[in-house]
Amino acid sequence: MKNVTDSFLSLGHWPFAGSFGFFNTDILSTNLINLSVVLGVLIFFGKGVCASCLLSDLLDNRKQRILNTIRNSEELRGGAIEQLEKARTRLRKVEMEADQFRVNGYSEIEREKLNLINSIYKTLEQLENYKNETIQFEQQRTINQVRQRVFQQALQGALGTLNSCLNNELHLRTISANIGILGSIKEKTD
């Protein structure tokens, strides 16, 4: 026992370079006491756990974590593939709807274009009719104005001729002749 006590007392005299205080970390100068202390600590804290069992458990745990990670990755991959397929399906559907809208839009544009052309033709036809009616109205008005002027000029010319040709005597004779004609018409009707 004295040797053991001396060994512990002599630990204080060991150099600290490369040591932890109680243990000599230099593998070549490690003595039997250090090895026994290390083995005692391992046995005390290990309590029936063998190194191969501990290593096996560590490897099994690591294997389970890796398998779980792979399983989770596969599930995520499957979900991502499913979402991708749904997105592709929606994309195809939207593209088909866009094509239908495009075709319907072109058809609608063509219909609107034809409606606009027809409307313009109708408007032009109405304008042509209004123009023709206006021309006819103006022609008729001009003809009426010309007739009135011709009539007025003819009347003035006739009155001028009558006034220049008629004197009092001729005027009285014309009146007497007209009275005679009216009198004979009256006798025939009675």
UniProtKB/Swiss-Prot annotation:
> Any transmembrane segments, and where?
35-55
A GO term for molecular function = proton-transporting ATP synthase activity, rotational mechanism
Which membrane topology describes this protein?
Single-pass membrane protein
Q: Superkingdom, according to UniProt?
A: Eukaryota
UniProt key word Cell wall biogenesis/degradation: no
Cellular component terms (Gene Ontology): chloroplast thylakoid membrane; proton-transporting ATP synthase complex
Q: Where in the cell is it found?
A: Plastid, Chloroplast thylakoid membrane
Q: Name one Pfam family in it.
A: ATP-synt_B
> Keywords, A to Z?
ATP synthesis, CF(0), Chloroplast, Hydrogen ion transport, Ion transport, Membrane, Plastid, Thylakoid, Transmembrane, Transmembrane helix, Transport
Q: Key word Hydrolase present in the record?
A: no
Describe, as the record does, how this protein assembles with itself and its partners.
Answer: F-type ATPases have 2 components, F(1) - the catalytic core - and F(0) - the membrane proton channel. F(1) has five subunits: alpha(3), beta(3), gamma(1), delta(1), epsilon(1). F(0) has four main subunits: a(1), b(1), b'(1) and c(10-14). The alpha and beta chains form an alternating ring which encloses part of the gamma chain. F(1) is attached to F(0) by a central stalk formed by the gamma and epsilon chains, while a peripheral stalk is formed by the delta, b and b' chains.
Give a short account of what the protein does: F(1)F(0) ATP synthase produces ATP from ADP in the presence of a proton or sodium gradient. F-type ATPases consist of two structural domains, F(1) containing the extramembraneous catalytic core and F(0) containing the membrane proton channel, linked together by a central stalk and a peripheral stalk. During catalysis, ATP synthesis in the catalytic domain of F(1) is coupled via a rotary mechanism of the central stalk subunits to proton translocation. Component of the F(0) channel, it forms part of the peripheral stalk, linking F(1) to F(0).
Stored HAMAP family: ATP_synth_b_bprime (MF_01398)
In its miscellaneous comment, the UniProt entry states: In plastids the F-type ATPase is also known as CF(1)CF(0).
> In which family does this protein belong, per the annotation?
Belongs to the ATPase B chain family.
What is this protein's record name? ATP synthase subunit b, chloroplastic
According to its UniProt entry, this protein's organism is: Coffea arabica
Q: Which gene encodes it?
A: atpF
